[in-house]
Amino acid sequence: MTQLPWMGLGLSTNLGPRDRPDPWWILDASPGAIDFVEYSAPLDPDVALAEAPRFSTLLERRHELPAIFHPVHLNLWGPALESEENLAALRAHLRRVGSPWVGNDVAWWHHRDAPFPGYLFVAPPFTRAGVEQAAAHAAHVQAAIEVPLLLENPAVLHRNGDLHVLDFMAALHARTGQPLLLDLGHLLAFQLVYGLEAEARLDGFPLEQVAEIHIAGGVITTRGARRFYVDDHGQPVREELFALLERILPRCTGLRAVTFEADGHPEPIALRTLERLRALVPRRREPQAAGIAAANDDAALEAPATCATASQDDGWGSAATAAPPGAVDGAAREAWRLFDLVHGAPADGVPDPDGLRAEVDFRLAVVAQRIDRAWPLTRAACAGDRAGLERFATSPEYRSLFDGSGRQLPAVFAAWARRVVREERLAGADAILAFESWCHGLLARVEAAPPGSGAIRLAPGVAVGSFPVDLSELLFAARTLRRHLADRAAAAGLYEGSGLEALRQIAARAAPGPWAVLLRRTGGAIAAEPLDPSFLRLVHLAARGATPADLPPADREALGRAVAAGVLVAGDR
């Protein structure tokens, strides 16, 4: 096994142009705050360079700030082994970056290279069969790469299997010999599912085989007698996790890194957490520092060895033994059964209906959030409540996301909505769907056209047009109705999305147009609003080549407002 160096304290990032925190800003502003960066990006390094703008910065500055690759595109469970093409890309990626290891949650992340929305993986059943299936995946990946694969405990919100997650991971380590990555938030999520203390079952867990620890933010909510922890890196770290980290650090004698997954935190806020973690995790591994076992910082250390007693005494077989034939084949039916369950498919006899409902709720919320960036009004009209979202998430259209065709969630939702509107004759929903389809078409035409060069022109990401029906009341109602329902939900603890049905009534009674509309695309989302008539006049004047100097005083005043509103650009700006 490759040797593992001491890495220290790291910060995670997604490498997008607006992703925060920026680890290189922190490195420059506060030297010594972090020792490495851990990041997610496409497996193919060339694709990462094209799609993740900060990947080039990572490569340029990796000698100042070493990097560890933490992909979210790597299956360590599921119906099929990772493709040879993906593994070749992963191998090339790790070589280019010089990542000392790669870690990933033991879960099903994608099917035929289509990731599940929000990268919400499907965790394996915590059973003996699940161990064998995951072991086959892990062995397949490890055989294709030149650095150690760290196995991370996945987060769950419902009970599925007869093993504690720590027992599952210990057995998986015994079966494969792979080092472990312990995610404290994921562990807390499991403990709450079973009503256990945060440290339950740690006494029998091989903490000495943990090479990396993840700590991140999350949210704890209460439903009846149950409490649930939702892993949300954009939230502050909870005190329960700081306390758990302090208690287990002295026992993690093989530890090489602690990573703060801080996605979405402004740099000054992230620095506060890093300062607290730095008191526990030294830059150099020195004797007795923070209770971590002594080691020479300059010496590369052997990767944690297989726990022989666990593999023999617990009957899991040795790490050198290949996974049984058909281990992955046996996962296919179970994987798709769980896929359907966590998306809301009806089922009898599930062991934890309350936990499963929490899991489905979280997943549907993420699906709705993604749809609302492209089809907010149509989603409200056709799938505004939980039942509607379940219908979509269990539909053939949704399943087609994962058939290898390359279709994206917004397009798949639009196809489903067209079918539902046609088959169920939803009065008003047809007008809403037609309007948002028109919006997409108009923006696509504007964005495909060469940029304007006139003295007055539309701002980037802006389009104006005329729709044959006046839906201005619909836009008003969508804002006020959502606010009304959100305010009630904040007090009552229940979001009654069925109330969004009123939008169909309003669209059905819309007055004839023409109706002037302003469209904006911001960060991938589309927003529509009625267009100020004075702005529309300016757009027409601009199309005829008018300059600011040509405008009468009233139009020049309107031009100033349009420029300030980000609708028009005047002159060379």
Where are these regions (language model features)?
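Boundary/entry segment of secreted carbohydrate-active catalytic domains
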Residues: 1-26
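Acidic (Asp/Glu)-rich catalytic clusters
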Residues: 25-32, 50-69, 85-100, 139-144, ...
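Conserved, mostly hydrophobic/aromatic
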Residues: 37, 102, 183, 213, ...
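Gly/Pro-rich active-site loop or hairpin
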Residues: 48-50, 81, 121-123, 128, ...
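Active-site acidic/histidine proton-transfer and metal-coordination neighborhood
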Residues: 83-180
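Acidic/histidine-rich catalytic cores of soluble enzymes
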Residues: 142-225
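Long, charge-rich, low-complexity alpha-helical segments
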Residues: 283, 292-453, 519-573
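Low-complexity, glycine/alanine/valine/leucine- and proline-rich hydrophobic stretches
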Residues: 462-544
